Amino acid sequence: MAAAAAAGAGPEMVRGQVFDVGPRYTNLSYIGEGAYGMVCSAYDNVNKVRVAIKKISPFEHQTYCQRTLREIKILLRFRHENIIGINDIIRAPTIEQMKDVYIVQDLMETDLYKLLKTQHLSNDHICYFLYQILRGLKYIHSANVLHRDLKPSNLLLNTTCDLKICDFGLARVADPDHDHTGFLTEYVATRWYRAPEIMLNSKGYTKSIDIWSVGCILAEMLSNRPIFPGKHYLDQLNHILGILGSPSQEDLNCIINLKARNYLLSLPHKNKVPWNRLFPNADSKALDLLDKMLTFNPHKRIEVEQALAHPYLEQYYDPSDEPIAEAPFKFDMELDDLPKEKLKELIFEETARFQPGYRS
């Protein structure tokens, strides 16, 4: 834990890192770190609560700039109880001085990944967590956004079992017609939660990839272990087919990539493993919904509104309290091709509203 900075004593240090967030945020305490930044909790002297502050230093890398800009653009436009918001952003007053960006968010005690390492969940908890994931996802999908990296560590939890989806750095506007060349190379989302079509096709992607990830998360809540822990690309596919069985001819016809289709045709026939054999203690309604989410063919996979209306979630289902976005989200430009200098300018502009004396 960093010592509390005395008023006016300059930035606090946390594990050798400068955290320049005073005077409003003090009493910093280390939480963890990701690929390009550290997260601390801090005391907000204005709202009198502890908050989470993520320090991001992305400006050396085009990919990190892209992810940072995506996350900020999306989260500043989203407003939903099951999606983490941005409360404040701290950065230098000029673009030349801006080396880091500090993002202030609600402090959540833990995440689903940490929880599943230590606790076996009751059916009631599984049901409530799944409902909140789908409630947040309904809003995301209504904005025409794909999260693309749903996994237990991106689901934040607090002691009252509130759940918030975080990390929109890989999110995209849904565009089933656009052929994202190089899709697989830039697709760094965790393999275990990846839909089979991501490994088999490169053309376009749809909201059904997020539903697949939610199915993987439900299976993990039922058993405290990942359902498809593939060691590499082909191993991942083999794990999936080992449980779902061989795809039907109709399902194979959806695979545009001939090499991928021929690979699947070359494999020995596998039978589907019954879900109640894998999860003998699970609620039968939970397994019915799991089956509809972990469907090989993305066109037959359940959609988020149908999933919310499934009998497993009937005690929570309330369409009048499951809000959607006001308007579909649009990125003005494809960020993939922009140089990091341009992305830095866009991050600077996007964060201006939090600067003292800002006038829109």
From Swiss-Prot:
Cofactor section: Mg(2+)
Residues bearing the modification Phosphoserine: S29, S246, S248, S284
Locations listed in the record: Cytoplasm, Cytoskeleton, Spindle; Nucleus; Cytoplasm, Cytoskeleton, Microtubule organizing center, Centrosome; Cytoplasm
Sequence motif: Cytoplasmic retention motif, positions: 318-322
Effect upon mutating I74N: In NS13; results in increased MAPK signaling; reduced interaction with DUSP6; no effect on interaction with MAP2K1
Chain residues forming the annotated DNA-binding region: 259-277
Placement of sequence motif TXY: 185-187
Motif Nuclear translocation motif: where in chain: 327-333
Outcome of swapping P323R: In NS13; results in increased MAPK signaling; increased translocation to the nucleus; reduced interaction with DUSP6; no effect on interaction with MAP2K1
Keywords: Acetylation, Apoptosis, ATP-binding, Cell cycle, Cell junction, Cytoplasm, Cytoskeleton, Disease variant, DNA-binding, Host-virus interaction, Kinase, Membrane, Nucleotide-binding, Nucleus, Phosphoprotein, Repressor, Serine/threonine-protein kinase, Transcription, Transcription regulation, Transferase, Ubl conjugation
Gene Ontology annotations for the cellular component aspect, listed alphabetically: azurophil granule lumen; caveola; centrosome; ciliary basal body; cilium; cytoplasm; cytoskeleton; cytosol
GO terms classed as biological process: apoptotic process; B cell receptor signaling pathway; Bergmann glial cell differentiation; cardiac neural crest cell development involved in heart development; caveolin-mediated endocytosis; cell surface receptor signaling pathway; cellular response to amino acid starvation; cellular response to tumor necrosis factor
GO MF annotation list: ATP binding; DNA binding; identical protein binding; MAP kinase activity; phosphatase binding; phosphotyrosine residue binding; protein serine kinase activity; protein serine/threonine kinase activity
Substrates-to-products reaction catalysed: L-seryl-[protein] + ATP = O-phospho-L-seryl-[protein] + ADP + H(+); L-threonyl-[protein] + ATP = O-phospho-L-threonyl-[protein] + ADP + H(+)
Activity regulation remarks: Phosphorylated by MAP2K1/MEK1 and MAP2K2/MEK2 on Thr-185 and Tyr-187 in response to external stimuli like insulin or NGF. Both phosphorylations are required for activity. This phosphorylation causes dramatic conformational changes, which enable full activation and interaction of MAPK1/ERK2 with its substrates. Phosphorylation on Ser-29 by SGK1 results in its activation by enhancing its interaction with MAP2K1/MEK1 and MAP2K2/MEK2. Dephosphorylated and inactivated by DUSP1, DUSP3, DUSP6 and DUSP9. Inactivated by pyrimidylpyrrole inhibitors.
Similarity remark: Belongs to the protein kinase superfamily. CMGC Ser/Thr protein kinase family. MAP kinase subfamily.
Function of the molecule: Serine/threonine kinase which acts as an essential component of the MAP kinase signal transduction pathway. MAPK1/ERK2 and MAPK3/ERK1 are the 2 MAPKs which play an important role in the MAPK/ERK cascade. They participate also in a signaling cascade initiated by activated KIT and KITLG/SCF. Depending on the cellular context, the MAPK/ERK cascade mediates diverse biological functions such as cell growth, adhesion, survival and differentiation through the regulation of transcription, translation, cytoskeletal rearrangements. Acts as a transcriptional repressor. Binds to a [GC]AAA[GC] consensus sequence. Repress the expression of interferon gamma-induced genes. Seems to bind to the promoter of CCL5, DMP1, IFIH1, IFITM1, IRF7, IRF9, LAMP3, OAS1, OAS2, OAS3 and STAT1. Transcriptional activity is independent of kinase activity.
Implicated disorder: Noonan syndrome 13: A form of Noonan syndrome, a disease characterized by short stature, facial dysmorphic features such as hypertelorism, a downward eyeslant and low-set posteriorly rotated ears, and a high incidence of congenital heart defects and hypertrophic cardiomyopathy. Other features can include a short neck with webbing or redundancy of skin, deafness, motor delay, variable intellectual deficits, multiple skeletal defects, cryptorchidism, and bleeding diathesis.
Comment on protein domains: The TXY motif contains the threonine and tyrosine residues whose phosphorylation activates the MAP kinases.
Complex formation: Binds both upstream activators and downstream substrates in multimolecular complexes. This interaction inhibits its tyrosine-kinase activity. Interacts with ADAM15, ARHGEF2, ARRB2, DAPK1 (via death domain), HSF4, IER3, IPO7, NISCH, SGK1, and isoform 1 of NEK2. Interacts (via phosphorylated form) with TPR (via C-terminal region and phosphorylated form); the interaction requires dimerization of MAPK1/ERK2 and increases following EGF stimulation. Interacts with MAP2K1. Interacts with DUSP6.
Name of the protein this chain belongs to: Mitogen-activated protein kinase 1
